[in-house]
């Protein structure tokens, strides 16, 4: 199947409604049903629970708790490298950021200004830099770690369409 045909349903389905429904289900305390769902997910995507601080699947009350599980100490030692990824995953795209350059993320084009919530001055500070798009598969650990000290000074909500993340759209 071509990439266009694989992505087409994402334009036709009610993305916000489906995302809200998935969020409610992921946060639901379903007892044995939640445990069965997590167990099936671990098996299907070959999730390495030995890396988790708590490898007991039955101890996660919600799918969100499982999905954002902490790692055990020492599971991700920092490499002595010039570049360290803050997440598990694979680099799906990498390139230079130039004035008004638009680059791909999730199969769609964005400008740096759009990616920082419409702040043109902030977007311009990235000109001359580089970007990397990191694809996290379902089996990947989904927390972000910074290999350096820092302080979060502000957060910006960036509205937009919600698209499935998979190798076709990554």
Predicted regions and their residues:
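Non-catalytic terminal segments and appended small domains
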Residues: 1-170
């Amino acid at each position: 199947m071509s990439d266009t045909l694989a992505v087409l349903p994402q334009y036709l389905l009610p993305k916000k409604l489906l995302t809200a429904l998935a969020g409610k289900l992921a946060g639901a305390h379903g007892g044995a049903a939640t445990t069965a769902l997590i167990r099936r997910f671990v098996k299907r995507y070959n999730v390495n629970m030995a890396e988790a601080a708590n490898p007991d699947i039955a101890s996660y009350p919600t799918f969100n708790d499982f999905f954002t599980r902490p790692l055990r100490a020492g599971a991700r030692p920092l490499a002595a490298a010039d570049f360290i990824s803050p997440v598990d995953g694979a680099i799906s795209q990498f390139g230079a950021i130039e004035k008004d350059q638009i680059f791909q993320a999730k199969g769609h084009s964005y400008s740096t200004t759009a990616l920082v919530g419409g702040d043109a001055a902030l977007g311009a500070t990235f000109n001359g830099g580089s970007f990397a798009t990191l694809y996290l598969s379902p089996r990947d650990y989904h927390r972000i770690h910074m290999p350096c000290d820092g302080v979060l000074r502000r957060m910006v909500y960036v509205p937009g369409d919600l698209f499935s993340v998979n190798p076709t759209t990554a």
